[in-house]
């Protein structure tokens, strides 16, 4: 495995971080046994100006996390399943990246397959117990690493975000084109290469 992504990696706009997380290695030791997978799909969410952002829903725990320290896990429940986000934003802003799907590496198969954000969390044993974990620190239950074995020059595609009723007019869902471990979500506008 390559080097651990530094804290500074997450101190950038969420869309930049989401795109650059593709191909990186997510390690979850949340259940005690460590599992590794390659990030294949991610969505960017901004602050209160983003109609799909949780930052618009009051000033509770999630709002504080979105404005909080970049590089920390943000785990919350939706539709009876856990979702894993990584806080990412420029200084003084808010934002996070929702990890939607990943390709299992070790073990080579996970049940359920980690395709879609709820299934990713379930397959990697992610729940509120890892909320706030620093993904840039060794020994954390969740970490993100460089991937020296990533396919050189894989194509990144992008589209609108999945399952949002009101969206920004930007393609904020990024994924590895042609990878079988990407959700088959219907979104508009149509996917394009980014």
Curated annotation (Swiss-Prot):
GO terms classed as biological process: base-excision repair
Keywords: DNA damage, DNA repair, Hydrolase
Pfam families xref list: Pur_DNA_glyco
InterPro entries: Formyl_transferase-like_C_sf, MPG, MPG_sf
Enzyme nomenclature, EC number: 3.2.2.-
Highest taxon of source: Archaea
Top enzyme class: hydrolase
MF term (GO), any: alkylbase DNA N-glycosylase activity
Kinase is among the record's keywords: no
Gene3D superfamilies per the UniProt record, alphabetical: Methylpurine-DNA glycosylase (MPG)
Family, similarity comment: Belongs to the DNA glycosylase MPG family.
Protein name: Putative 3-methyladenine DNA glycosylase
Gene source species: Aeropyrum pernix (strain ATCC 700893 / DSM 11879 / JCM 9820 / NBRC 100138 / K1)
């Amino acid at each position: 495995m390559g080097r651990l992504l530094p804290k500074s990696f997450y101190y950038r706009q969420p869309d930049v971080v989401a795109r650059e997380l593709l191909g990186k290695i997510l390690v979850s030791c949340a259940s005690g046994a460590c599992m590794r997978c390659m990030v294949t799909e991610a969505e960017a969410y901004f602050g209160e100006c983003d109609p799909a952002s949780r930052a618009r829903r009051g000033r509770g725990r999630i709002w504080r996390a979105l404005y909080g320290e970049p590089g920390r896990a943000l785990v919350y429940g939706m539709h009876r399943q856990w979702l894993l986000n990584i806080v990412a934003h420029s200084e003084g802003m808010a934002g996070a990246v929702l990890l939607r799907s990943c390709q299992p590496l070790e073990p080579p198969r996970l049940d359920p397959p980690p395709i879609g954000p709820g299934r990713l969390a379930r397959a990697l044993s992610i729940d509120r117990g890892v909320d706030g974990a620093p993904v840039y620190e060794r020994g954390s239950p969740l970490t993100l690493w460089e991937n020296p074995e990533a396919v050189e020059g894989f194509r990144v595609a992008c589209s609108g975000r999945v399952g949002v009723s009101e969206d920004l007019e930007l393609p904020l869902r990024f994924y590895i084109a042609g990878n079988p471990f990407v959700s088959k979500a219907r979104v508009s506008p149509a996917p394009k290469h980014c």
